[in-house]
């Protein structure tokens, strides 16, 4: 393992879990894929660092896998709600730093929140929000709900904003909103100089409360 490589574990290898594994692995991270289904584990073994058949609703299994050594653990167990909740509880009690969990509905999400899940994803709901935001504003290229009312969005600079600076947009004056960076061509500039003059086609990446982001984008 290279120093500085992030380590992720994904528990549950349905379509969602496998997609998460592949994206994380392609980004250069170290990925452990876990499922009770041997066929799914074999599929994941073709592209992740390590794939194991195991049941993470057992405390001994979680201890043996040393999940507390991982930067993040994603619990992507789909159909079995009880297994998802139990795996989350065991992971938190084992000292896992950051537990992300896929939830099927708001009731499950509330239960997961109460037992300590650090981040809850509801894929169908989140995709619906993303699509709606992009339909409402064609400048929005990506809209990612992050949970707890927060979202990250990427929007493109058009003719109305050309020649203005990042400071002129006053994004950071909106409570809770931060500019993470912007993209010009292939280059991504993190922590950008707010005096940067914008050009048509620049992508601006911001994070903040969903409602405040939406209202601010309408005003630009």
Curated annotation (Swiss-Prot):
Q: Which Gene Ontology BP terms does the record give?
A: potassium ion transport
User: In the UniProt record, what gene is named as encoding this protein?
Assistant: ktrA
The protein in question is named Ktr system potassium uptake protein A
Using the record, list the residue span of the signal peptide; answer none if the entry has no such feature: none
For the keyword ATP-binding, the answer is: yes
Binding sites annotated in the UniProt record for ATP: 15, 35-37, 55-56, 77-79, 102-104, 124
Which organism is this protein's natural source?
Vibrio alginolyticus
Q: What is the lineage of its organism?
A: Bacteria, Pseudomonadati, Pseudomonadota, Gammaproteobacteria, Vibrionales
Extract one GO cellular component term from the record.
plasma membrane
Q: How is its activity regulated?
A: Requires both ATP and a high membrane potential for activity. Binding of ATP causes a conformational change in KtrA, which promotes formation of the KtrAB complex. Can also bind, with lower affinity, other nucleotides such as NADH or NAD(+), but only ATP can induce a conformational change.
Keyword Transport among record annotations = yes
The protein's topology relative to the membrane is:
Peripheral membrane protein
Pfam families in the record, alphabetically?
Answer: TrkA_C, TrkA_N
Q: Where in the cell is it found?
A: Cell inner membrane
What's this protein's family per the entry? Belongs to the KtrA potassium transport family.
Which molecular-function annotations from GO does this UniProt entry contain? ATP binding; monoatomic cation transmembrane transporter activity
- Write down the InterPro entries for this protein, in alphabetical order: NAD(P)-bd_dom_sf, RCK_C, RCK_C_sf, RCK_N, Trk_Ktr_HKT_K-transport
Question: What does it do?
Answer: Part of the Na(+)-dependent high affinity K(+) uptake system KtrAB. KtrA is the regulatory subunit and plays an important role in the substrate specificity and transport mechanism of the system. Binds ATP but lacks ATPase activity.
Print the keywords alphabetically: ATP-binding, Cell inner membrane, Cell membrane, Ion transport, Membrane, Nucleotide-binding, Potassium, Potassium transport, Transport
**Coiled-coil blocks:** none
Residue limits of the RCK C-terminal domain? Answer: 138-220
Name the predominant localization: membrane
- Gene3D superfamilies noted in UniProt: NAD(P)-binding Rossmann-like Domain, Regulator of K+ conductance, C-terminal domain
Describe the protein's quaternary organization and the partners it interacts with.
The uptake system is composed of KtrA and KtrB.
- Pinpoint the RCK N-terminal domain residues: 5-121
């Amino acid at each position: 393992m290279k120093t500085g490589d992030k380590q992720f574990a994904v528990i549950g290898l349905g379509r969602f879990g496998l997609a998460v594994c592949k994206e994380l692995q392609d980004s250069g991270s170290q990925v452990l894929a876990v499922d009770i289904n041997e066929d799914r584990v074999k599929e994941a073994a073709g592209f992740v660092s390590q794939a194991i058949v195991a049941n993470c609703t057992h405390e001994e299994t979680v201890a043996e896998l040393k999940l507390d050594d991982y930067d993040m653990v994603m619990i992507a167990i789909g159909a079995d709600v009880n297994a998802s909740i139990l795996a989350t509880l065991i992971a938190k009690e084992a000292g896992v730093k950051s537990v992300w969990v896929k939830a099927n509905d708001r009731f499950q999400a509330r239960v997961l929140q109460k037992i300590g899940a650090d981040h809850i994803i509801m894929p169908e709901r989140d995709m619906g929000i993303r699509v709606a935001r992009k339909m409402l504003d064609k400048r929005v290229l990506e809209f990612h709900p992050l949970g707890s009312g927060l979202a990250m969005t990427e929007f493109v600079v058009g003719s109305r904003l050309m020649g203005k600076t990042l400071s002129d947009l006053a994004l950071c004056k909106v409570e809770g909103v931060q500019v993470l960076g912007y993209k010009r061509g292939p280059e991504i500039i993190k922590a950008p100089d707010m005096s940067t003059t914008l050009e048509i086609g620049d992508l601006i990446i911001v994070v903040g409360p969903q409602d405040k982001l939406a209202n601010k984008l309408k005003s630009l």
